[in-house]
Amino acid sequence: MSFTGRTAVVTGGSRGIGRAICLELARRGANVVFSYAGNTAAAEATRKELEALGVQTRAVQGSVADPAAVKTLIDTAVKELGSLDILVNNAGITR
């Protein structure tokens, strides 16, 4: 299934399952906006991998427990990439 021209938002997208979801969406043509809690190096590495697949991508730092951060995430997708077509709520707590 192709997602070309669609914009996906993935919470917790810089590592683990979230990263894998971001990469698969990008392989299928989706532009990807993802959130990350605090590991800037992991977020930057994921962003570069997504760009190498030829899609537009944005990494937005913030917690999904913070309504203002969630608004920023959604606003980034809509304002910078034009829409929000796919939402993957993946963020979790690593203990």
Label each PLM-derived region with a short phrase.
Residues L25:
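Aromatic pocket-lining residues of Rossmann-like dinucleotide-binding sites
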Residues T46-G54:
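Short, conserved SAM-binding/catalytic segment
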Residues F3-T4, L53-Q56, D75-N89, R95:
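A glycine-rich helix->loop->beta "capping" turn
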Residues V9, V33, R58-V60, E80, ...:
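Conserved Rossmann-like nucleotide-binding pocket used by diverse enzymes
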Residues T40-A41, Q61-D75:
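The beta1-alpha1 cofactor-binding region of Rossmann-like NAD(H)/NADP(H)-dependent oxidoreductases
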Residues T7, G12-G16:
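Conserved glycine-rich cofactor-binding loop
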Residues R28-A45:
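Conserved glycine-rich Rossmann-like NAD(P)H-binding loop of the short-chain dehydrogenase/reductase
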